[in-house]
Amino acid sequence: MGVLQTQDLTARFGGHVAVNAVSCRFEPGTLTAIVGPNGAGKTTYFNLISGQLPATEGRVHLDGQELTGLSASARTRAGLGRAFQLTNLFPNLTVLENVRLAVQATEEGAHLRGLNLWSIWQDHAKLTRQAQDILQQVSMMTQANATVASLPHGDQRKLEVALLMALKPSVYMFDEPTAGMSQDEAPVILNLIRQLKSDKTKTILLVEHKMDVVRELADRIIVLHNGQLVADGEPAEVMASAVVQEAYLGVKPEAVVASEGLKSKVMHSEEDV
């Protein structure tokens, strides 16, 4: 299904609290943008969810399964798929080989079959077809035999989305997906995210600084500031929030108290996993 929930998720580094008891529930069929000023704790929150960092306190659940004590790779197998700000690819392999490896990682039982030449050939042919199907979806078949190192930055990010698709996650996590892209490259990635969003069985989380991208893609926005969840709601409502303006601009409008009601009911939900 892709129901992701964090409960009182916290990260402390010495005396610094990078993420402070953040509780959120993310539902399938929605794209949630996680925004906030630099140092707000957005990427740290992502790291806690995906298992790149251990939580000091709190829990992470996906479809009722607790992920808190699992490694990053185990969380990937459970259904969390994360793209990084820096591409995480094999530069000396071809585009097709990269995707085929990702497809192979999701295949269950292939490695348990007898090691005869026929089964090896069948597995290879099947994986290749699946990888080619994914490359067709992201319009990269013409680059299938190119090495990753030869691709421009925008195409490498595009390939990273293809790798995520190969893993068949129920939750997609994008951390600054258009970072470092030109004005011509960024729309390609955004179109891929739109395609993923059209699948109402998937849950999408997006960390993004570009507010025009957030306004266009997000069904919901949560705002972190100094590691705390300060606003959670629909884009228009959150954008107009005095709490959000204070977090970004450092100015405390008179209306800030009235805006505190923007914190989502999700954060205060009494529903247990």
Language-model segments: what does each one mean?
Residues 1-273:
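Glycine-rich phosphate-binding loops of nucleotide-dependent enzymes
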